[in-house]
Amino acid sequence: MKETITKQLIAVQQASREIITLTDETINSLLCALADSIPSHQEAILQANQKDIERMDPADPMVDRLLLNASRLDAIAADIRNVASLPSPLDALLEERVLPNGLNLKKVTVPIGVIGIIYEARPNVTFDVFALCLKSGNATVLKGGSDAMYSNIAIVELIHSVLKQHGINPDTLYLLPAEREAAAVMLNAVGYIDMIIPRGSQKLIDFVRNNAKVPVIETGAGIVHTYFDKSGDLDLGKHIIFNAKTRRPSVCNALDTLVIHQERLADLPALVEPLQEKQVMLFADEAAFQALQGSYPDDLLHQAEPEHFGTEFLSLKMSVKTVSSLEEALEHITRYSSRHSEAIIATDPETTATFLKRVDAAVVYANTSTAFTDGAQFGLGAEIGISTQKLHARGPMALKELTTYKWIIEGNGQTRPA
């Protein structure tokens, strides 16, 4: 398997050198053609997706991530068109200066080269990643989860067909075999893949980080907190918490832990009351549990165990932590946060400012839902993931974050003195 994959990676490298020669107009034309082709291939894609769905437990929260339907395919097509409409991130002049010796220095954006993506049961990522990588001048190597195998194969077949129709090398996109051995080859493909981005659970991200020799940018895992301060507005808090927890519980920006100031425990039943509508299960510490007994359904209320804090639930479950001060809230968040998205609900300006300054996360919110952590919501277009690290990219990784830069130096015969 290694020999076969390596041979294909060499072809992908060659394709990456060809992509650099494409104009932005050519890339945009191809992306729009891909979006236009989705409706006519909808039946084949949905049939493949149904084969994947049938292999999963219907109660598994990952089913929502795996599911494709007509409306989701329409949204994917719209996202691809949106990527095509965005300005090219390439050849942007970042810096320019003329040195005393007359040399003209320019710092310009260029593609990274070959980007590898390893991800779990989200076939929409296959479309998104291809569009973003092509728009930013990169070739793409995909390692999808076995749960989405049939969906990914159908999607990549469509993309390859559109590439060929436009005279573009289909090796621009390579879908690795579903076997686990393929992931090991990918993670060690130094010299063939320039960067790997894992998208999925903390377990997947840890596996990639611990086993990759290729540079990695961590994305995805979100252990998300919202702190309801003693100065928090109750009505505001109810709407924010409901939205952050229930809008799409299986995504990485969904709320996992509500941290509440002990002086507002009397308001806790009202604060979480809307969650009953969605059957949200609460794991509350002792103080919060006592405050909720008799007001929150017994079958949905449980006493928290240590493991409930620091868990990315990805489902209709949420932990509740009581704190005695802002300082204790910050300590709790620092201990358990994945540095993805964190929020405060407060009306006191000093408390809010302290929280925003001291919380170490890619995105920090005041009096709004963490569900907004999304490239499109930020006005960046579709994103390849949410980076939770600090090097190269942080937060939504859109087109700009899929480029690097090089220095271009022009002279007229200058030589460096001995």
UniProtKB/Swiss-Prot annotation:
It catalyses: L-glutamate 5-semialdehyde + phosphate + NADP(+) = L-glutamyl 5-phosphate + NADPH + H(+). GO terms for cellular component: cytoplasm. Pathway: Amino-acid biosynthesis; L-proline biosynthesis; L-glutamate 5-semialdehyde from L-glutamate: step 2/2. Coiled coil: none annotated. SUPFAM superfamilies: ALDH-like. The keyword Cell cycle does not apply. It is an enzyme of class 1 (oxidoreductase). It is found in: Cytoplasm. It comes from the Bacteria. Gene3D superfamilies: Aldehyde Dehydrogenase, Chain A, domain 1, Aldehyde Dehydrogenase, Chain A, domain 2. One of its GO terms (molecular function) is glutamate-5-semialdehyde dehydrogenase activity. Keywords: Amino-acid biosynthesis, Cytoplasm, NADP, Oxidoreductase, Proline biosynthesis. Its main location: cytoplasm. Catalyzes the NADPH-dependent reduction of L-glutamate 5-phosphate into L-glutamate 5-semialdehyde and phosphate. The product spontaneously undergoes cyclization to form 1-pyrroline-5-carboxylate. PANTHER family: DELTA-1-PYRROLINE-5-CARBOXYLATE SYNTHASE, GLUTAMATE SEMIALDEHYDE DEHYDROGENASE. Belongs to the gamma-glutamyl phosphate reductase family. This is Gamma-glutamyl phosphate reductase. It comes from Pelodictyon phaeoclathratiforme (strain DSM 5477 / BU-1). The gene is proA.
